[in-house]
Each structure stands twice: as structure tokens, then as C-alpha cells.
């Protein structure tokens, strides 16, 4: 974002523009930026004409223009397009050497760059940014669900197949029509990314779900990664910040950054599952009585220690999918339609935001949460084959995998896990994932190249593991594209192998399991 020329006009020049009754030409309306910019302008009553080199049938996000009155030229940038417009907005990805700029300059059409759009049209509603390592998508989707249930309309990017935390999406989404902007932010550990979003969206509140190792190489430092998430903390000084105080990394970060503002904490009162350790800000290792990976009760001699949160979930029953939330204004029973302790955390953070940010009553919140069926790809049941349940889950980092597998063990007992992950933490992360799989699953099918490589190493050291690790007939080829760790064929082979194991539940984990989940339909037939 910092390497892109975002603005072409000074603040003084922008303030002097007379945009009344002007027609805006947007290049690249089939792309993310062009699509969102066009809709922002139309939401504010402007006339927009679009153009894109894609054919109409290939325009990926065409359906998001349903309900809008927009003229679009597909397959070219015709002369008449330039004749009709008063201002033109090119996508930031368009090279300045592109021929279209010669036409623009020849016709002397004023250019507005993306940065000019950001300056001209600030968010006109309250904004909340949600970040953390795990739980962002579920928390964002659930808070939107609660808002809709209460009669509020959150802004929606409506870009089919796109997560809302990529590149410019959150910053542009906050400028679309709606009563409130509920934004998933901070998809990776890149410094400056969150800060840019906060600068452009001007949020008044935020949720920090947890901080665990993700998107890290073997040489990376969890605390450096935490500082990236700390950009949200910095940006919300003097404003509202909702945090999971069961996470010592978060509470230490707040202390390190000397946060002052409306800090609201949440956490669980639950029996710990095991002892865990994370690096403390003082340089020591901090021991955690873990409820789920990386969070629980803790006490470091440097002064970072567990304290009872403002909102706490008690009387948790995973069987009945309910818990009691105790907060500043009393105790209330919450019934969930989703499963697992990690989702109790997600629900609790959303409850706090619904109360403190949206100002909703517990009656509305209770009803809304009880009707939320979850996010596709999060412990999602895809169907049944020979009376066996097949599920997929996006878990792709060691902490997320451990949490999901632990909860599956509690809920379903014996199960088989098909691993399609190639950890962004490298070989170390792949080893952690297989160790967790051995701890919680009855059978493990390493379907990705990375998981198969680690499985072969484990079996070489301990041949008895072949009782639990079930290899596919085809050896996975070396493949990785960011967090995508397996091909469609490898996912198919993994699920086929999993169906031959003696359990009633099979779960495929990782981005590839989600991307290629349609292969499960082949087995249903």
C-alpha cells in the first residue's frame, strides 16, 4: 500500500473540486478496487460509467452491481466511454505506461486516484475493526449477523469468493452504504498494514481476539508479530478496545504500548486443558493454564498476570452449547448454534461489541446468537457418506489446528483428520500440527506434501505410528501456494483414504480442504 501512488491532488485542490452532476468513469470495474470505487460513488448519488477489458461473462464481481444503475463497457475502452465522462478513476495497479493514459491525457480528462477517493469520501458511519490470529472471520460474521437481527445494515463488499480482509477491501468497504462498518482486518503479519487501514477507516472500536504464532517462519518472533497487531491498539488510543484478556501476549502488548482508552476485557471461566508456554514481553517464558491454545490463566513475575475480565463466560456446557455471560449489567444465558470452546470465545467477544459498540439489548443478542449457524469452512459439515460425517475446517496454523482438533475430540470422540496444510511456520509448524493430530485424532491422513514429509519422518523414527498414520496410495507432489498446501487431487485422495478408516467422523483441515471441498460430492454419489 505504501508503494502505490494513492493521491494525485492536494487537500486544497480536492476541496476546490465541484463534483455536482459530474459523471465518473471507472476503469477496471470487474476488479476489486474498481468495483468498490464505482459502488461508493453510486451510493453517494453520482452517475458512474464503467469499463473493463474482461468480457461480460468473465466479469468476476458483476453480481455486486445488481440494483445499481451503471453502464459498463466490456472487452475494451471505447472512444464513447471517454466522451461521456467528466472525471476518470484508474485502478492503482494500472501501469502509468498503459495506452489508456495517452487517451486520458489527450482528452484532458481529470484523473482521480484511489487516494483522492479516500480523501473525498470519508466513512460516514461508526467503524469497528476486528483482528487477531484466529477467530476474525467468525467474530466478524457473527457481529454482522447480530446487527442484521437488530435491524442494522452493515456495509458489505459483496465480492463473491473474497475474504474482506484483503488489500484495500476494508478501507473501501467502510465507505459503502450501511448503518455500521464491521471490518475484518489484519490478514497477516505485515508491518504497516493495520495502521494503513486504521488511518483510512478511522474506527471508534476494535476487537483483538488472540495472538498466536501464524504466518511466521522458523526465525520469526511472536512478539514482533504481536507488535503488528499492536497497530490496532495504537490506533484506538482514547477510543474503545475490546480484548481477550485470557491472552497474556495481548495484555502485555497493551502494557508495552501504554494504552489509555476504553479498554473492555473478556474471557472464560473454564477448567484448563493443559499447561502451555508463550514468550513474555520481559524475555521470560510465561506459563499458561491453557483453556485453548495460548490463552488461559497466567502469572509472570514481571507483573503480567491474569485478572478477572469485565465480561466472563461461566457454566459452559459444550454438550448443550450454552454458557452464562456475567458482565457489568448482570448475568444472562447464551445458547449457541455453533460448537467448541473457541466459539465461546468468539461469541463472547461479539456479545461485548454488541453491548458496548452497537448498544444492543441482551434479548436481541441472545436471539441472534442462537440462530447463527456458523461460517462456511469452520467446522462445516459437508454431508454423509456411508453414515460417516465429513467436515472441513480452515484451521491452518498450529494454534488453530490444536484448538479445532481438541474441540472435535470433545464433541465427536474418535475421528480421522485429513491434513491438507503446508504451515507458514515452515517445517517446525508442520511438525507441531502432526503432533497435535496424533494427540487428538484416532487416525491421521497426511494429504499435503509437507504433512506427508513429516509423517514419513515420524514413521521412520517410530514404525508403530503406522497404526495411526494412514498414508494415501499416491505420494503428494511438492506444492505450496501461500497457505494452500495441497492440490485438488491430493484433497480427493486424502478424503478417500479417510473414508476407509474405522471412525464415523472425518475432518479435512486447511485452506485446500476449503478450496476443493466440492470433491466431497464425488463420494456422496
Where are these regions (language model features)?
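Short amphipathic alpha-helix with an adjacent loop that forms part of the alpha/beta core around
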Residues: 77-84, 199, 492-500
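Glycine-rich, highly charged phosphate/nucleotide-binding loops
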Residues: 66-80
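Acidic, Mg2+-coordinating active-site environments of NTP-dependent enzymes
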Residues: 80-85, 90, 96-110, 152, ...
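ATP-dependent carboxylate-amine ligase
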Residues: 1-57, 70, 88, 109, ...
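Phosphate-binding loop of NTP-binding sites
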Residues: 13-23, 33, 37-44, 62-63, ...
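Short beta-strand "acidic-cap" motif of Rossmann-like dinucleotide-binding folds
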Residues: 47-52, 155-156, 265
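Short loop/edge segments at beta-strand edges and connector loops
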Residues: 74-76, 113-115, 158, 243-245, ...
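Short, ordered loop/turn segments at secondary-structure junctions
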Residues: 53-54, 77, 116-117, 159-160, ...
Amino acid at each position: 500500500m505504501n508503494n502505490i501512488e494513492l493521491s494525485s491532488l492536494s487537500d486544497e485542490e480536492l476541496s476546490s473540486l465541484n463534483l455536482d452532476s459530474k459523471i465518473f468513469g471507472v476503469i477496471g470495474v470487474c476488479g476489486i478496487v474498481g468495483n468498490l470505487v464505482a459502488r461508493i460513488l453510486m451510493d453517494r448519488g453520482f452517475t458512474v460509467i464503467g469499463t473493463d477489458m474482461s468480457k461480460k461473462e468473465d466479469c468476476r464481481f458483476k453480481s455486486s452491481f445488481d440494483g445499481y444503475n451503471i453502464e459498463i463497457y466490456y472487452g475494451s475502452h471505447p472512444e464513447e466511454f471517454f466522451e461521456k465522462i467528466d472525471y476518470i478513476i484508474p485502478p492503482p495497479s494500472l501501469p502509468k505506461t498503459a495506452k489508456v493514459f495517452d487517451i486520458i491525457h489527450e482528452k484532458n480528462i481529470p484523473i482521480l486516484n484511489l487516494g483522492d477517493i479516500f480523501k473525498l469520501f470519508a466513512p460516514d458511519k461508526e467503524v469497528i475493526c476486528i483482528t487477531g490470529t484466529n477467530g476474525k472471520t467468525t467474530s466478524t460474521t457473527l457481529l454482522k449477523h447480530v446487527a442484521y437481527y437488530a435491524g442494522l445494515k452493515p456495509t458489505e463488499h459483496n465480492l463473491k469468493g473474497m475474504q474482506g480482509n484483503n488489500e484495500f477491501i476494508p478501507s473501501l468497504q467502510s465507505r459503502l452504504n450501511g448503518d455500521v462498518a464491521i471490518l475484518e482486518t489484519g490478514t497477516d503479519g505485515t508491518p504497516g498494514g493495520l495502521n494503513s487501514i486504521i488511518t483510512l477507516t478511522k474506527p471508534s472500536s476494535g476487537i483483538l481476539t488472540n495472538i498466536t504464532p501464524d504466518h511466521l517462519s522458523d526465525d520469526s518472533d511472536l512478539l514482533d508479530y504481536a507488535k503488528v497487531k499492536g497497530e490496532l491498539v495504537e490506533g484506538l488510543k482514547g477510543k474503545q478496545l475490546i480484548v481477550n484478556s485470557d491472552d497474556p501476549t495481548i495484555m502485555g502488548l497493551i502494557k508495552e504500548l501504554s494504552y489509555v482508552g476504553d479498554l473492555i476485557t473478556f474471557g472464560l471461566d473454564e477448567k484448563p486443558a493443559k499447561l502451555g508456554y508463550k514468550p513474555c514481553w520481559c524475555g521470560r517464558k510465561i506459563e499458561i493454564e491453557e483453556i485453548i491454545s495460548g490463552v488461559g490463566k497466567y502469572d509472570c513475575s514481571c507483573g503480567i498476570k491474569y485478572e478477572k475480565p469485565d465480561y466472563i463466560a461461566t457454566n459452559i456446557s459444550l454438550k448443550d452449547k450454552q454458557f452464562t455471560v456475567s458482565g457489568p449489567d448482570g448475568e444472562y444465558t447464551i445458547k449457541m448454534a455453533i460448537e467448541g470452546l473457541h466459539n465461546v470465545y468468539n461469541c463472547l467477544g461479539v456479545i461485548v461489541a454488541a453491548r458496548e459498540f452497537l448498544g444492543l439489548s441482551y434479548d436481541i443478542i441472545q436471539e441472534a446468537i442462537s440462530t447463527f449457524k456458523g461460517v462456511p469452512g469452520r467446522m462445516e459439515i459437508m454431508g454423509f457418506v456411508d453414515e460417516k460425517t465429513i467436515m472441513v475446517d480452515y484451521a491452518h496454523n498450529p494454534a488453530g489446528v490444536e484448538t479445532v482438533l481438541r474441540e472435535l475430540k470433545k464433541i465427536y470422540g474418535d475421528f480421522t483428520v485429513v491434513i491438507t496444510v503446508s504451515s507458514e511456520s515452515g517445517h517446525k509448524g508442520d511438525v507441531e500440527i502432526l503432533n497435535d493430530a496424533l494427540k487428538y485424532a484416532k487416525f491421521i491422513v497426511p494429504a499435503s506434501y509437507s504433512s506427508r514429509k513429516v509423517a514419513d519422518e515420524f514413521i521412520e523414527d517410530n514404525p508403530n505410528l503406522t497404526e495411526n498414520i494412514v498414508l494415501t496410495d499416491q505420494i503428494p507432489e511438492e506444492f505450496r501456494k501461500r497457505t494452500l498446501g495441497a492440490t485438488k487431487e491430493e484433497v480427493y485422495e486424502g478424503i478417500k483414504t479417510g473414508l476407509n478408516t474405522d471412525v464415523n467422523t472425518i475432518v479435512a483441515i486447511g485452506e485446500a480442504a476449503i478450496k476443493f471441498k466440492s470433491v466431497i460430492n464425488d463420494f456422496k454419489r
